[in-house]
UniProtKB/Swiss-Prot annotation:
Organism whose genome encodes this protein: Amoebophilus asiaticus (strain 5a2)
Note describing how the cofactor binds: Binds 1 zinc ion.
UniProt keyword Hydrolase, yes or no: yes
Cofactor(s) this protein requires: Zn(2+)
Protein name: Endoribonuclease YbeY
Amino acid sequence: MPKANIYYFVEDIQFKLPNPKIITDWIHNVIQQENCQLVNLNFIFCSDNFLHKKNLKYLQHDTLTDVITFSYAEDQKNIEGEIYISIERVSDNATTYQIDFWQELYTVMIHGVLHLLGYNDETLLEQEEMRKKESIYMLANRIVNLH
């Protein structure tokens, strides 16, 4: 069976993802390592304002956020969804945490993918597991210094 596609879109900002083929292969690899299959995945890179409106409309949260993930999958083994990422939040977070912008972006991207794979981050224990998985997939796939 051929690989399902991952699509990248931009809303309300100017942004270009470097090396989309490498990123796509990386995400496919992560999904396979989790014993799941990709059906369809859209990344939407956007502004704070665009994502804030989504946050209000769909989650009733009146806050800025770096990522919102929507799963459309019928089961947890078949991954289908959208991941919205605020480039402005990623940039601010990178400055706050004193890390490279691209490292923060790729971490946020894999964070969204992990949500689609069934990982949560509501409790401290879940957050620890999520961070551990993020680190494993960032390092194992040498994604940290990609740009």
